[in-house]
């Protein structure tokens, strides 16, 4: 072994001066830095000689068969893998992620790279006498793990998680960070990508998100292509590396985004806010985790209540919202959510393009479920009587309709008023469900055969409440907030209340007239439309339209001081949340009056997010041209007070925000350049990020910037003090007889959130209180071990739980996983066999149509992408009844299968209705057929 290693050492010393521009070599720090850090993975190097490396360099990538140069060979003992680098598909990195083989050598330069340590390794270090170090995860030493193929563990032992050390909870920047702050790395422009670079730098300087990827990088696991979360993890690791590279190239992340969203292909300039939404949507989709919830069945319930209220008093409590629909419209203008299924599957059951809008609705529905349960459980909703009116008289005639839905307003649920005060139906908080470890095991009767029908979330009895799928991710934890809007009919005084989840606020920039209305509406009882900036930008008639355009053009060319008072961010917020009269062409359809009525719409925030993203609507796209509103909007660097926009019954404690970063656009609507100003969290200084250039700037420079997107973070000195107190306790390390396991994700919240919420250990526990089998292989990435005194302090301060002293693989989940895996395999094999037989038929007599929406759910289940089987077959969206016959709806999203395949799926899942297509039968006259045969014979004879 020593001799073989000597070959590599001598060879490496010869070729080290040869340095090529390779993707992985961009990550290689200087040589002295590498020598100062010992790599604990050198003991895994197998025996290899110079001749072996030369022979491998003449070969090809074992996956894509591309030839060198710059192939990478795995150095793991008994592994002969050779893969391509980042100049191609980067199969070498994929191999390392899948096998946890960390050491690889470039067969052209013979330089060695360790994926786990994220640094260059010199093999002559292994020849020394220094003992090997145990592998301990450092705070910023990230290990890129991918999702392994699902295998049921054969044993019930778990790796012992690490004990939390002082660095795990320390939030103070050390002296080295203050002198040479990390995170000051630029991003190279790779073809009009300044919009992406500015957006990435703004997100990179959001500590809750970046710290999640740096400290919980092992949780960036997904089997969904193109694995944006892994590319983002890699980028954050490079940007915040202690070696402080001058700039990096975000090629992998950009290629992944372009694969999913065609908008960003090519080299044209794009919108930074659109890129932000697309990126965060993809990260949520890949990182989301399911949390089981219990919900009333039926889903749509209406409550009858009376409201005889003083209208003026109602106006006092609610300012109007031109509306929450502003953000809806902005979102729709920028395109639908961008998701994609894995296009590289070896077996596509039915070739069909993924319906991105449906997937968008699915996620919006998931996020809706997240916020519904959080809002209702904490009692902040409670029909919001006080927020609507302080004088409410109840009788049995009038109605308050409570709606809860997502931003797209696609999924609406009306809630019983008596349910709103029934906490046992919903969990006590979003992150903690006290029944997760106390619930009885799921039914073991999980499809023992093909005969019994299986229905999703099937209840044992009609009276049982059904389980509803709820999802959360680090994205929703950080950026999701809730708006409560209310529409009051001015005829019958009926009030309809709606909860909407938002990830950013798209604020209008009020003009001079709008500012005058906002500032003059100091009397809250007057019903005045005082913030409908949309009206100012949508005049009726061509003459007014042209004059408005000329006016805005002149305004954009003349300094803002010439036109009147300075517009502040508070003005934009007031315009967004202002009272909105619904009249004229915009009358309210009252469900009680059954007519169009005049109404008033109010809007306030029920829950503020940890990081508030504010988008200023500077770009307006007219019929034939686009314009940019260049009005300067002043914004505070610290102390943004959002108390005036908070709902009265909101449980929010912290409503003050400090600025983290701001994205600016210089230029016109058709061309321009994006930069970002960001505050470094380690030294609290402001920097300008202009592609690969990073420059320190003053606070006044930031305040004078033309803001387009702003990121604000909740400010809490109390949270800072609490973190320091816990860090000091951890540094003392009192001896204790018991050790407690705690979620890494929650610890990240504790370190970076102003309001971390109750402790939640449910991300590594199943509903039975054990570790799910699929998480057993990487449990050390999910938990840390705390001494008893630290746990006691955290638990007494934040509550939650459950307390965990012992980790074990859940036997019940293991049995269920084996059953469900067997079911997947059987259903998939039978479908493939039946579908192949169907494809061989030349002219089938009948076709059975099936909803592609349902089929995609079933396909995700049998391929292991979704843990739950779909519900009954639902063909109602593709079927239409004419003259008593069920026919295929024109343009329906449907697929064609054989009768045998339909019977197979229907026998398992049930549902319907049957939609049958019968190809028309062409009757041929025998005389004509005989004449054609005669002509054919004569032709052949010639």
From Swiss-Prot:
Positions contributing to Zn(2+) 3 binding: 74, 79, 95, 101
Catalysis: reaction(s): Thiol-dependent hydrolysis of ester, thioester, amide, peptide and isopeptide bonds formed by the C-terminal Gly of ubiquitin (a 76-residue protein attached to proteins as an intracellular targeting signal)
Location of the active site: 194, 673
Query: Which segments constitute the USP domain?
Result: 185-715
Annotated DUSP domain ranges read 717-810, 818-921
Q: Which InterPro entries match?
A: DUSP-like_sf, Papain-like_cys_pep_sf, Pept_C19_DUSP, Peptidase_C19_UCH, Ub_carboxyl-term_hydrolase, USP_CS, USP_dom, Znf_RING/FYVE/PHD
Q: Please name the PROSITE patterns in this protein's record.
A: DUSP, USP_1, USP_2, USP_3, ZF_UBP
Instruction: Return the GO cellular component terms, semicolon-separated.
Output: centrosome; cytoplasm; cytosol; focal adhesion; Golgi apparatus; neuronal cell body; nucleoplasm; perinuclear region of cytoplasm
User: Could you say which tissues express the protein in this record?
Assistant: Widely expressed.
Q: Which UniProt keywords apply?
A: Cytoplasm, Cytoskeleton, Endocytosis, Golgi apparatus, Hydrolase, Metal-binding, Phosphoprotein, Protease, Repeat, Thiol protease, Ubl conjugation, Ubl conjugation pathway, Zinc, Zinc-finger
Q: Where is the composition biased (Basic residues)?
A: 453-469
Return the Polar residues bias intervals. 315-327, 419-431
GO MF assignments: cysteine-type deubiquitinase activity; cysteine-type endopeptidase activity; G protein-coupled receptor binding; small GTPase binding; zinc ion binding
Its Enzyme Commission number(s) read 3.4.19.12
Q: Which residues bind Zn(2+) 2?
A: 61, 64, 84, 91
Sites of Phosphoserine modification? 377, 439
- SMART domains (alphabetical): DUSP, ZnF_UBP
User: Segment Disordered: which positions?
Assistant: 294-357, 419-469
Where does it reside? Answer: Cytoplasm, Perinuclear region; Cytoplasm, Cytoskeleton, Microtubule organizing center, Centrosome
Q: What does this protein do?
A: Deubiquitinating enzyme involved in various processes such as centrosome duplication, cellular migration and beta-2 adrenergic receptor/ADRB2 recycling. Involved in regulation of centrosome duplication by mediating deubiquitination of CCP110 in S and G2/M phase, leading to stabilize CCP110 during the period which centrioles duplicate and elongate. Involved in cell migration via its interaction with intracellular domain of ROBO1, leading to regulate the Slit signaling.
Q: Kindly give the PANTHER family that the UniProt entry links to this protein.
A: UBIQUITIN CARBOXYL-TERMINAL HYDROLASE (PTHR21646), UBIQUITIN CARBOXYL-TERMINAL HYDROLASE 33 (PTHR21646:SF32)
Q: Which family does it belong to?
A: Belongs to the peptidase C19 family. USP20/USP33 subfamily.
Q: What is known of its domains?
A: The UBP-type zinc finger binds 3 zinc ions. However, it does not bind ubiquitin, probably because the conserved Arg in position 86 is replaced by a Glu residue.
How it assembles, according to the record, is: Interacts with VHL, leading to its ubiquitination and subsequent degradation. Interacts with ARRB1 and ARRB2. Interacts with ADRB2. Interacts with DIO2. Interacts with ROBO1. Interacts with SELENBP1; in a selenium-dependent manner. Interacts with CCP110.
**Protein name from the UniProt record:** Ubiquitin carboxyl-terminal hydrolase 33
Originating species? Homo sapiens
State the organism's lineage.
Eukaryota, Metazoa, Chordata, Craniata, Vertebrata
């Amino acid at each position: 072994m020593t001799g073989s290693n000597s070959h590599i050492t001598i060879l490496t010393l010869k070729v080290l001066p040869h340095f090529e521009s390779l993707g992985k070599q961009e990550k290689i720090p200087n040589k002295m830095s590498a020598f100062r850090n010992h790599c604990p993975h050198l003991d895994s190097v197998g025996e290899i000689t110079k001749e072996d490396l030369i022979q491998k360099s003449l070969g090809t990538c074992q996956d894509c068969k591309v030839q060198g140069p710059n192939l990478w060979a795995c150095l793991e003992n008994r592994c002969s893998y050779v893969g391509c680098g980042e100049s191609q598909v980067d199969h070498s990195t994929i191999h390392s992620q899948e096998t946890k083989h960390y050491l690889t050598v470039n067969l052209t330069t013979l330089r060695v790279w360790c994926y786990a340590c994220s640094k260059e390794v010199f093999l002559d270090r292994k020849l020394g006498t220094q003992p090997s170090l145990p592998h301990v995860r450092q705070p910023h030493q990230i290990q890129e793990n991918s999702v392994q193929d699902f295998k049921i563990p054969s044993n019930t032992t778990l790796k012992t998680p690490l004990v939390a050390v002082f660095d795990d909870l320390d939030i103070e920047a050390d002296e080295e960070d203050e002198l040479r702050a990390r995170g000051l790395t630029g991003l190279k422009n790779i073809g009009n990508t300044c919009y992406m670079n500015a957006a990435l730098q703004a997100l990179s300087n959001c500590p809750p998100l970046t710290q999640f990827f740096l400290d919980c990088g092992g949780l960036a696991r997904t089997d969904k292509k193109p694995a944006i979360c892994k590319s983002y993890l890699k980028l954050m690791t490079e940007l915040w590396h202690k070696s402080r590279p001058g700039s990096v190239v975000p090629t992998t992340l950009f290629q992944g985004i372009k694969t999913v969203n065609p908008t960003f292909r090519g080299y044209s300039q794009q919108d930074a806010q659109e890129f932000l939404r697309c990126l965060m949507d993809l990260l949520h989709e890949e990182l989301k985790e399911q949390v089981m919830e219990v919900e009333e069945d039926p889903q749509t319930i209406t409550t009858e209540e009376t409201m005889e209220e003083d209208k003026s008093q109602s106006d006092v409590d609610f300012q109007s919202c031109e509306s929450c629909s502003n953000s809806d419209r902005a979102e729709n203008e920028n395109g639908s959510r961008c998701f994609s299924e894995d296009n590289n599957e070896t077996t596509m059951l039915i070739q069909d393009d993924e319906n991105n809008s449906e997937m968008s609705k699915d996620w919006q529905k998931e996020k809706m479920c997240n916020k519904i349960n959080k809002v209702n459980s904490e009692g902040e909703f409670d029909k919001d009587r006080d927020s609507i009116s302080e004088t409410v008289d109840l009788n049995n005639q009038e109605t308050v309709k409570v709606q809860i839905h997502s931003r797209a307003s696609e999924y609406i649920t009306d809630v019983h008023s008596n349910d709103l005060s029934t906490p046992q139906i919903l969990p006590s908080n979003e992150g903690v469900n006290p029944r997760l470890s106390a619930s009885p095991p799921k039914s073991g009767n999980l499809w023992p055969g093909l005969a019994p029908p299986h229905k999703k979330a099937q209840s044992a009895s009609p009276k049982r409440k059904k389980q509803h799928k709820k999802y959360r991710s680090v994205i929703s934890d950080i950026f999701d907030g809730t708006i409560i809007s209310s529409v009051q009919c001015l005829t019958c005084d009926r009030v309809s209340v709606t909860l909407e989840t938002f990830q950013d606020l798209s604020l209008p920039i009020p003009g001079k007239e709008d500012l005058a209305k906002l500032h003059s509406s100091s009397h809250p009882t007057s019903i005045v439309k005082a913030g409908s900036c949309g009206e100012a930008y949508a005049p009726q008639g061509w003459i007014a339209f042209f004059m408005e355009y000329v006016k805005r053009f002149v305004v954009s060319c003349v300094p803002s001081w010439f036109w009147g008072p300075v517009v502040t961010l508070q003005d934009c917020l007031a315009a967004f949340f202002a009272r909105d009269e619904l009249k004229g062409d915009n009358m309210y359809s009252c469900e009680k009056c059954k007519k169009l009525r005049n109404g008033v719409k109010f809007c306030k925030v029920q829950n503020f997010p940890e990081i508030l993203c504010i988008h200023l609507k500077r770009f307006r796209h007219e019929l034939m041209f686009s314009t940019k509103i260049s009005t300067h909007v002043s914004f505070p660097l610290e102390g943004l007070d959002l108390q005036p926009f908070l709902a009265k019954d909101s449980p929010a404690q912290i409503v003050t925000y400090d600025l983290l970063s701001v994205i600016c656009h210089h230029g016109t609507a058709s061309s321009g350049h994006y930069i970002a100003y960001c505050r470094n969290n380690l030294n609290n200084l402001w920097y300008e990020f202009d592609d690969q250039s990073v420059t320190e700037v003053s606070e006044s420079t930031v305040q004078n910037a033309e803001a387009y997107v702003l990121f604000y973070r909740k400010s809490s000195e109390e949270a800072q003090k609490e973190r320091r107190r816990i860090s000091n306790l951890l540094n003392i390390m009192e001896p204790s007889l018991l050790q407690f396991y705690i979620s890494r994700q929650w610890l990240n919240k504790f370190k970076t959130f102003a309001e971390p919420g109750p402790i939640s250990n449910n991300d590594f526990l199943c509903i039975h209180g054990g570790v799910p089998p699929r998480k057993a292989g990487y449990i050390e990435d999910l938990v840390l071990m705390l001494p008893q005194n630290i746990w006691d302090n955290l638990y007494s301060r934040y509550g939650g739980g459950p307390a965990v002293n012992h980790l074990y693989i859940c036997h019940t989940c293991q049995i269920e996983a084996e059953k469900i895996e067997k079911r997947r395999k059987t259903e998939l094999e039978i479908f493939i066999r039946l579908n192949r037989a169907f494809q061989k038929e030349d002219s089938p007599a009948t076709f059975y149509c099936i909803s592609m929406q349902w089929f995609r759910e079933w396909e995700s289940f049998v391929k292991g992408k979704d843990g739950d089987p779909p519900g009954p077959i639902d063909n109602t969206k593709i079927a239409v009844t004419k003259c008593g016959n069920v026919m295929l709806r024109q343009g329906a999203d449907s697929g064609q299968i054989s009768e045998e395949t339909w019977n197979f799926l229907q026998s398992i899942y049930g549902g319907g209705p049957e939609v049958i297509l019968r190809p028309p039968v062409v009757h041929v006259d025998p005389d004509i057929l005989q004449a054609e045969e005669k002509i054919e014979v004569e032709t052949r004879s010639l």
